[in-house]
Curated annotation (Swiss-Prot):
Organism: Homo sapiens
Disulfide linkage: none
Induction info: Highly expressed in mitotic cells from metaphase to telophase. Expression in non-mitotic cells is very low.
Protein name: Ubiquilin-2
Implicated disorder: Amyotrophic lateral sclerosis 15, with or without frontotemporal dementia: A neurodegenerative disorder affecting upper motor neurons in the brain and lower motor neurons in the brain stem and spinal cord, resulting in fatal paralysis. Sensory abnormalities are absent. The pathologic hallmarks of the disease include pallor of the corticospinal tract due to loss of motor neurons, presence of ubiquitin-positive inclusions within surviving motor neurons, and deposition of pathologic aggregates.
Name of the gene: UBQLN2
Subcellular location(s) of the protein: Cytoplasm; Nucleus; Membrane; Cytoplasmic vesicle, Autophagosome
Modified-residue entries (N-acetylalanine), positions: A2
Gene Ontology MF term list: identical protein binding; molecular condensate scaffold activity; polyubiquitin modification-dependent protein binding
UniProt feature, compositional bias: Pro residues: 316-325
Region (Disordered) location: 1-32, 106-141, 287-349, 512-556
UniProt PTM: Degraded during macroautophagy.
Length: 624
């Protein structure tokens, strides 16, 4: 028995090492877990070992999303996962969701270091620089704004494409650069009615994919949204822009003084790392980069790394102060000084016109605007989807029926805010433009890439003529009419098919700067659209002398203005009489004590029906 015991003893120790080997082999073949990786637009499921590192997890994700590992940012439970950590350390188990943000590579240094990766990623690195050359990545729509904040039923607008994302980003940047426009939007009755409905706002917020991710990472936010008192207080603050601005200033001041408190600097760093940095990284492709990136790079380079030990008593600058118009004023002064030899009044008018032309030309000659026009030309499906949607038609119809709203939108645009001269010349053309936008021929021409290309060629040709042959375009004077267009270019007949494209001209750098802009509404009733000199000669008898000085400085603007007036003559019978159109405003002005009906009508025509601007105009014209 002893021998048997001894003989049976050795197998037991032999099983011990086998068991030890089995236990040692268990970590080598760990449990496979399924983790869902969710981006703002899609989600994928990955099967990875439980003890995988974040770097290994990123390598698996990069193959599926065709991106480099250094572009991937993984967020779980409100924290950014570091490459050296493992999934177990962060508590990532089977069935959980990890959020992914794909960063864009804007710096060429990052692209030059990509070929040093593995051979499996070299193929993607060869293809990613081409796609990353665009400002907006096709995988990026972090806030779900392609579908208008997650609103259902608006996908037919075609707003999820890359080109519209770039257009949307530019509009958002202009909106953020114009706080007055943001305030007026918040004070809009429609927006106020939306903010007064907590249930509707809660539904809109919960429908936003970005807010859904934020709620998943921070469940306490859902409790705030479900609290009616907090929602009511928040919406009351949102309805009061002045209160919101004051709260923002107080918060900025409190954060600036937080550094002087012991431990405050670390709290600021932790808040930035855990909250602000993930949100900014998620939004950087939409808004053009992290606005604090330069601050971080400068602080890491040497200066400003030590926290402040004293209280900051310097007043904060006013972030809502309008930017100084030094460049525009300098341009105006130089242009007026160059034309001072021909008289004071004519030189001022010439200087203002040239300054307005330079202002608009500088905007439309920017690479971003040229790229946008090129993308619109190359992507007719986007324009067709937008213009054929019933929402766009109803919006254009409502704007044409409410010229006050259209004029207010134009005045609030950053393009016109800093240039009153451009505002005065665009107001008379606005009703004709809105009605032309409802013309089916105009909509079909805008969705036709060849028609858009022809329009761009016309614009480029006019600019070339104005530069190379300035003596040719002065022949198109206001008194001659558009009949010269037929003799100089060809028969009058081929001019009429271009009529639907006429409203696009105000978007060109030289379109809105016609010197006879205020007479636009008076010209269409006399013109028949046939190209004869009948229409323009009615309103050009007197202005022919006053606009002669500007014909030398901007003859191409006169030519474009004549085209716009002639092409708008086709829809002239649809325009109501100004007295009928502004009947309500005239009655209000009469009740206020402005008894001169003719002066009131002229003020309303000049201001596009804006009664507040008309009152200011009437008060300014009265002798003091």
């Amino acid at each position: 028995m002893a021998e048997n015991g001894e003989s049976s003893g050795p197998p037991r120790p032999s099983r011990g090492p086998a068991a030890a080997q089995g236990s040692a082999a268990a970590p080598a073949e760990p449990k496979i877990i399924k983790v869902t990786v969710k981006t703002p637009k899609e989600k994928e499921e990955f099967a990875v070992p439980e003890n995988s590192s974040v770097q290994q997890f990123k390598e698996a994700i990069s193959k599926r999303f065709k991106s480099q590992t250094d572009q991937l940012v993984l967020i779980f439970a409100g924290k950014i996962l570091k490459d050296q950590d493992t999934l177990i350390q962060h508590g990532i188990h089977d069935g959980l969701t990890v959020h992914l943000v794909i960063k864009s590579q804007n710096r060429p240094q990052g692209q030059s270091t990509q070929p040093s990766n593995a051979a499996g990623t070299n193929t993607t690195s060869a293809s990613t620089p081409r796609s990353n050359s665009t400002p907006i990545s096709t995988n990026s729509n972090p806030f779900g704004l392609g579908s208008l904040g997650g609103l259902a039923g608006l996908s037919s607008l075609g707003l999820s494409s890359t080109n519209f994302s770039e257009l949307q980003s530019q509009m958002q940047q202009q909106l953020m650069a114009s706080p007055e426009m943001m305030i007026q939007i918040m004070e809009n009755p429609f927006v106020q009615s939306m903010l007064s409905n907590p249930d509707l706002m809660r539904q809109l917020i919960m429908a936003n994919p970005q807010m859904q991710q934020l709620i998943q990472r921070n469940p306490e936010i859902s409790h705030l949204l479900n609290n009616p008192d907090i929602m009511r207080q928040t919406l009351e603050i949102a309805r009061n822009p002045a209160m919101m601005q004051e709260m923002m200033r107080n918060q900025d001041l409190a954060l600036s003084n937080l550094e002087s408190i012991p431990g405050g600097y670390n709290a600021l760093r932790r808040m930035y790392t855990d909250i602000q940095e993930p949100m900014l990284n998620a939004a950087q492709e939409q808004f053009g980069g992290n606005p604090f990136a330069s601050v971080g790079s400068s602080s890491s380079s040497g200066e400003g790394t030590q926290p402040s030990r004293t209280e900051n008593r310097d007043p904060l600058p006013n972030p809502w102060a309008p930017p100084p118009a030094t460049q525009s004023s300098a341009t105006t002064s130089t242009t007026t000084s160059t034309g001072s030899g021909s008289g004071n009044s004519s030189s001022n008018a010439t200087g203002n016109t040239v300054a307005a032309a330079n202002y608009v030309a500088s905007i439309f000659s920017t690479p971003g605007m040229q790229s946008l026009l090129q993308q619109i030309t190359e992507n007719p499906q986007l324009i067709q989807n937008m213009l054929s949607a019933p929402y766009m038609r109803s919006m254009m119809q409502s704007l044409s029926q409410n010229p006050d709203l259209a004029a207010q939108m134009m005045l609030n645009s950053p393009l016109f805010t800093a240039n009153p001269q451009l505002q005065e010349q665009m107001r008379p053309q606005l009703p004709a433009f809105l009605q032309q936008m409802q013309n089916p021929d105009t909509l079909s021409a805008m969705s036709n890439p060849r028609a858009m290309q022809a329009l761009m060629q016309i614009q480029q040709g006019l600019q070339t003529l104005a530069t190379e042959a300035p003596g040719l375009i002065p022949s198109f004077t206001p008194g001659v009419g558009v009949g010269v267009l037929g003799t100089a270019i060809g028969p009058v007949g081929p001019v009429t098919p271009i009529g639907p494209i006429g409203p696009i001209v105000p978007f060109t750098p030289i379109g809105p700067i016609g010197p006879i802009g205020p007479t636009g509404p008076a010209a269409p009733p006399g013109s028949t659209g046939s190209g004869g000199p009948t229409g323009p000669t009615v309103s050009s008898a007197a202005p022919s002398e006053t606009t002669s000085p500007t014909s030398e400085s901007g003859p191409n603007q006169q030519f474009i203005q004549q085209m716009v007036q002639a092409l708008a003559g086709a829809n002239a019978p649809q325009l109501p009489n100004p007295e009928v159109r502004f009947q309500q405003q005239l009655e209000q002005l009469n009740a206020m004590g402005f008894l001169n009906r003719e002066a009131n009508l002229q003020a309303l025509i000049a201001t596009g029906g804006d009664i507040n601007a008309a009152i200011e105009r009437l008060l300014g014209s009265q002798p003091s």
